[in-house]
């Protein structure tokens, strides 16, 4: 290769890198992660009905490939995102905020929220008959949740503990927490053969646990924190900037999934039953979806509460000024909080 050709190729490469995102080809494969449970129902609907593929094709992106890896726990999801194994992720709001604060200011790693995903009530269930309130948990109790310290369940527990014992003791029950995916926590709690005797979880697991006469509910997150958004979807700033049409297609697919759930609760229940890793009946899922605390919306509602709490106890070093600082401009027209 002569010097002139090398110079020409170098110039072309530099020009390609300098092109705005809209001028580059967008990805032809997107990896979207989801976890277990009702909170991920919109993503489950999107997967079964191939909504991302349809909206991407309508946007002129052709036939894209969509894969749906399963992850549970904020730390695991964030590690996968940072390693380049994911493009878009459904995650508990605190896990997203943790990575947002950690990566802010680093152009290669910065992340932002694409949309809110879901809200429901997390129930703290226990098999210890002596445990009636948070104050009754002792050193021999073990509380299962998908991830310790920064997962949705972990931070919600800390927020509830701070309300009960004072902000200075927000992590008082952290030594009792054990990292277990929700399906495993359900099995452990009902079997009674494991060290785990409590679980802070979401539907369907929280409902199914109460079918056992050994299990009782200690507390509901809604009673303490209100009915705020629990899960969101996010991606890296780089992915969003380089794939604007795909991001818009994803959001359109998410809104269509939300509309389907609202319009056809029975059909949505069938979708969930087919996808569930635990045995649950259609009627049971219908009951969960009928709960007024269970909502699916792209509007983030109360997400800033997590950030304010996490900043106050110094688990994040950067505090967002508003919810719009956490989320990309595509949803700034919404009445979020």
PLM regions and their residue ranges:
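Secondary-structure end/capping motifs
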Residues: 241-317
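Sec/Tat signal peptide C-region and signal peptidase I cleavage site
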Residues: 19-25
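Soluble non-cytosolic domains of exported or imported proteins
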Residues: 71-75, 90, 147, 151-155, ...
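Short, glycine-/small- and polar/acidic-enriched structural segments
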Residues: 26-170, 175-179, 193, 197-203, ...
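Pocket-lining segment of extracytoplasmic ligand-binding domains
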Residues: 166, 171, 178, 183-274
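Bacterial N-terminal signal peptides that target proteins for export
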Residues: 1-11
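Conserved C-terminal helix/tail region of periplasmic/extracytoplasmic solute-binding proteins
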Residues: 310-337
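Hydrophobic helical h-region of N-terminal Sec-dependent signal peptides
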Residues: 10-18
